[in-house]
């Protein structure tokens, strides 16, 4: 797995306010844990620890809604 911003299908991050929301999102996707990274590169976004390789992560480039 890898530590990364978990991405939606459009390469957009999951915006957040609470660590609990991200921890739930990340662990549901197979990560060991997650938290809300405040004021990061993509604003307030969920960061996952040890996310499985088959789960999309935010990569450079635009987020397409």
UniProtKB/Swiss-Prot annotation:
GO biological process, one term: defense response
One cellular component term from this protein's GO annotations in UniProt: extracellular region
Occurrences of domain LCN-type CS-alpha/beta (ranges): 2-64
Bridged cysteine pairs (disulfide): 12-63, 16-36, 22-46, 26-48
Subcellular location: Secreted
The entry's keywords: Amidation, Disulfide bond, Ion channel impairing toxin, Neurotoxin, Secreted, Toxin, Voltage-gated sodium channel impairing toxin
Keyword match Disulfide bond: yes
Phenylalanine amide PTM sites in chain numbering: 65
Record carries keyword Secreted: yes
Expression across tissues: Expressed by the venom gland.
SUPFAM superfamilies, per the entry: Scorpion toxin-like
GO MF entries: sodium channel inhibitor activity; toxin activity
InterPro entries referenced in this protein's UniProt entry, alphabetically: LCN-type_CS_alpha_beta_dom (IPR044062), Scorpion_toxin-like (IPR003614), Scorpion_toxin-like_sf (IPR036574), Scorpion_toxinL (IPR018218), Scorpion_toxinL/defensin (IPR002061)
Similarity annotation: Belongs to the long (4 C-C) scorpion toxin superfamily. Sodium channel inhibitor family. Alpha subfamily.
Domain remarks: Has the structural arrangement of an alpha-helix connected to antiparallel beta-sheets by disulfide bonds (CS-alpha/beta).
Function: Alpha toxins bind voltage-independently at site-3 of sodium channels (Nav) and inhibit the inactivation of the activated channels, thereby blocking neuronal transmission.
Name the UniProt record assigns to this protein: Alpha-toxin Bot1
Species name: Buthus occitanus tunetanus
Organism placement in taxonomy: Eukaryota, Metazoa, Ecdysozoa, Arthropoda, Chelicerata
């Amino acid at each position: 797995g890898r530590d990364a911003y978990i991405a939606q299908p459009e390469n957009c991050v999951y915006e957040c306010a609470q660590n609990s929301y991200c921890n739930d999102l990340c662990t549901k996707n197979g990560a060991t844990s997650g938290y809300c990274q405040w004021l990061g590169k993509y604003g307030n976004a969920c960061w996952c620890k040890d996310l499985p390789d088959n789960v999309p992560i935010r990569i450079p480039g635009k987020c397409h809604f």
